[in-house]
């Protein structure tokens, strides 16, 4: 009997302790919460300071995050969304589901940052990655790629931020000629995946000659695997920039904790994790600088970026052109 009473009392105390620990729910993309992504290290570092339970929820790829939040609306369990980018922020703001954070920081971004709702945490350039042992002379642009017999894997712009980035990359570089570029590229495309992880996995398994990824992707192979055979192909048209962001939900039940997390994201404790887990440039250079190996990455001679306020309208037109070209 005493054992039963003791056990019951212990369970009550455990329940009270659990109830007193605030939970912060963060929706993000799948690769962020993978064992090799930033999620585990970020969770450990933040929980050491917040007295809370940080729970990441993988919700597909970046563009799928916004779709899920819009579907859930005010009923969403998310306190913070991490993994949108500037191609989606205007659309996200129009939903009315996100609240200003007021976070300010001295960012090391290639562009000025004035948005007080969305907090940037990393950035990079899209690129086609290839294996130098299999492809000695990579194409130097979209037209050269389309004229080749190389096979590529790309991501769906409706669910993936890299896929959307490619869409706007082609549109920004070629304007009215974009439909022709897509028609010419259609024979090169092996498949269109829902997200980045699937596409990159296919490339590593030898199912394509090149994959849409980032100029920083070869750093993973160089630093984590001591493999210098992967490289990003410089394109004459320039490379499209991605700035990834996070924001708190207006309906969060943990507004102060959400703000604390966003503030943590611009601290060295978070930013120092990004280069060798998310394999992107951090929004703020860590105190110890970038890891050795990042200096070997290509630097685009020209960078492209559609302003957030214009990406909305341009995206719809570019998506229609893309769908038409790939359906032929």
Task: Locate predicted features.
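Extracytoplasmic ligand-binding site segments that recognize negatively charged/polar headgroups
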Residues: 23, 27-39, 60-64, 76-208
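Short alpha-helix C-terminal cap/hinge motif
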Residues: 40-56
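A ligand-binding cleft/hinge motif common to bilobed small-molecule-binding domains
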Residues: 87-91, 204, 208-229, 278
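Short beta-strand->loop
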Residues: 98-105, 116-120, 143, 222-240, ...
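Periplasmic-binding protein-like
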Residues: 111, 124, 182-186, 192-193, ...
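A bilobed periplasmic-binding-protein/Venus flytrap-type ligand-binding module shared by bacterial periplasmic
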Residues: 127-134, 171, 242-255, 273-276
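Mature extracytoplasmic/periplasmic domains
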Residues: 249-305
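Extracellular/periplasmic bilobal clamshell ligand-binding domains
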Residues: 291-328
């Amino acid at each position: 009997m005493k054992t039963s009473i003791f056990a019951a009392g212990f369970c009550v105390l455990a329940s009270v302790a659990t109830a007193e620990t605030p939970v912060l729910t963060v929706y993000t993309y799948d690769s962020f919460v993978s064992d090799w992504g930033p999620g585990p290290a970020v969770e450990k570092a933040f929980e050491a300071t917040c007295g809370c339970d940080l729970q990441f929820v993988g919700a597909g790829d970046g563009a799928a995050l916004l779709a899920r939040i819009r579907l859930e609306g005010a009923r969403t369990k998310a306190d913070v969304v991490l993994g949108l980018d500037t191609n989606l922020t205007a659309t996200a703001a129009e939903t009315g589901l996100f609240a200003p954070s007021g976070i300010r920081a001295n960012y090391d971004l290639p562009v000025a940052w004035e948005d007080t709702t969305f907090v940037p945490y990393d950035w990079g350039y899209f690129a086609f990655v290839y294996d130098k042992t299999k492809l000695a002379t990579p194409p130097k642009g979209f037209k050269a790629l389309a004229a080749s017999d190389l096979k590529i894997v790309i991501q769906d712009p409706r669910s993936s931020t890299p896929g959307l980035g490619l869409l706007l990359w082609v549109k920004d570089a070629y304007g009215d000629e974009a439909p022709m570029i897509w028609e010419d590229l259609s024979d090169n495309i092996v498949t269109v995946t829902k997200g980045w992880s699937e596409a990159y996995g296919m490339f590593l398994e030898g199912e394509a000659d090149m994959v849409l990824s980032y100029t920083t992707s070869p750093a993973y192979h160089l630093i984590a695997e001591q493999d210098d055979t992967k490289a990003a192909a410089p394109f004459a048209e320039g490379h499209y920039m991605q700035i990834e962001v996070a924001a708190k939900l207006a309906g969060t039940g943990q507004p102060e904790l959400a703000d604390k997390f966003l503030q943590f994201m611009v601290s060295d404790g978070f930013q120092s994790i990004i280069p060798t887990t998310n394999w992107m440039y951090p929004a703020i250079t860590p105190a110890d600088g970038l890891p050795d190996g990042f200096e070997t990455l290509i630097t685009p001679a020209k960078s492209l970026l559609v302003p957030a306020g214009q990406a909305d309208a341009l995206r719809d037109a570019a998506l229609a052109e893309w769908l038409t070209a790939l359906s032929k």
